[in-house]
Amino acid sequence: IGKGLTIPHHSGIVVHFAVDIGENLILRQNTTIGKIDGDMSDSRIRIGNNVNIGANCCIIGLSRKIGDNATIGAMSFINKDIPSNCTYITKKTGVVLHK
């Protein structure tokens, strides 16, 4: 874990031991960062410097990279690499069923 880690709200955060965290990460509540349980490979999730992760996010996979200066929007699901200097949000669609 790099210096400058900020956790504004300390509830519901899960970070797997195979995660490398750069400097100045902002990590918000109800977020999970991890890989598959039981995976014993050397793969790691790498989070760059100056990354901002919104609330209620899920970042999973065997080997993922979040680049420097990336922003992950609230309620995002990440199962692929995110390049540096970008903002990522998961587009959500809702279905309303009328009775």
Please annotate each region the language model reported.
Residues 92-95:
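Conserved switch/coupling elements of ABC/ABC-like ATPase nucleotide-binding domains
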